[in-house]
Amino acid sequence: MEPVRPVPPPGRPDPPRAGSQAAVKLARLLREAGYESLRIQERLATGEELLARSPELPSYLRRLGDADELAVLLRLLLLGVPVTRARVEEHVGDALREHLGNAGLLVPDGDAVHGAARLVPHDELLIASDHAGAAETHADHVPGVHRPSVALAHLTVRRSGERALDLCTGNGIQAILLAAHAEHVVATDVNGRALAYATFNAALNGADNIETRAGSFFEPVMGEQFDLVVANPPYVVSPESAYLFRDGGMRGDAVSELVVRGTPPSLAPGAFACVLIAWSLDPGDPAARPRRWLEGSGCDAFLLHTSTDDPIETATVWNRDLVDRPEAYADALDRWLAYYRELGIERLGYACLVLRKRADGRDGWVEALQLPRSALRPAGRHVERLFETRGRLARMAAGRALLGRRPRVVDDAVVSQDTRFSGGRWHAQALSLRLESGLPFSAELDPPTARLLRELDGSQTLEEALAAAVDDDHARDEGLALARRMLEIGFLELDDEAEGDR
């Protein structure tokens, strides 16, 4: 009978390990066996990202069977289900089986074999972590890639630089991504098991410029500066101290405050940081607490606000592993809700805070942007462009100096219009504008705005475009303000920088 949940191996295996050459060979053998995202999605008949959980385990097992190499590998390394030793020897090639064994990824158990770790493809990467579900008894559990870590990767500004820092590296995926455009990456974590996974994953993906350091938050890099910092800390506002990856052991949102206040001193002038945070949100001023944490930081910042949850939503999300144990699940929800009542928390905000260290050291601006709940996509260049445009607008001598520039609609903007059938006829709906890449912003367009956008192709000044699109001075003033706002969020871009902008 097929299992209904992952079956942990006997004992607790150490994280896998391999030298750089052996790890690269292992990755090559896995890919040759079809252990890649698209092939796996085809076999499992899913378009879902292969993240840290496999809720459809019974369905997946029945689709796979166990009579070919990829099926056996997926059972062992993705789904966490043992396979008979005979099946492993019959279907997994000798070289691959040897490399998996040498890396500690196969655990014999009588006539069965277990996968010692979960191995998941993400785009071109392979990322190992502890199997999902193993967190129930181990504080140092190392999870796989979750949606927040995907969001952080998508929102990170990726510029070439000498030194980068991955704070609270976990399984190391952010450090590996940084290694592609930084000469040297430092990855820190208080969890030694996480550092072991990060080391293995770096080798598996051919990233030989990553240095791991053990320690809490900024302690391992005190006094150092970096060209880029990313951080996925244990930001969850939690009454627990059970899991290092989730619970920071501090009261309320103190972990997020510590990381936000500690990041600017670690940034070189002009450097960027991308940090995931959570905070007790004031509905009257949602960005109040993060803005206060940034006072005196010498940074400009965009607070990319991804979601707002009530206490029950938060408690449910972070305790869903207990759903098969109803009494423990109910107790955890009650404990978390009591904690939020004690702290007076009615709403919790979640965001990626993107910082840029000012060269002049002065206090900068902080702007909150609400991101749609739709799936994020790679947007680092869009985020960087927002900083560049904001700086150029600030350098213009006067507000109306923008009238002499030649803004244009960005290449990935799309205008569309729906029609609705009602009362025996078709009715045109409002025009809408959206971006097909970068941050998933969209907006409805009224007719004057649509006319203005048609004029903004970069061939004429904004003043000329406004004169062609609207009829009176009041409408032109409104159009100027609207064009400025559309520049600030990336629907428009400016022409090449002129002398007056500097």
Give the location of each predicted region.
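Conserved Class I SAM-dependent methyltransferase catalytic core
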Residues: 191, 252-305
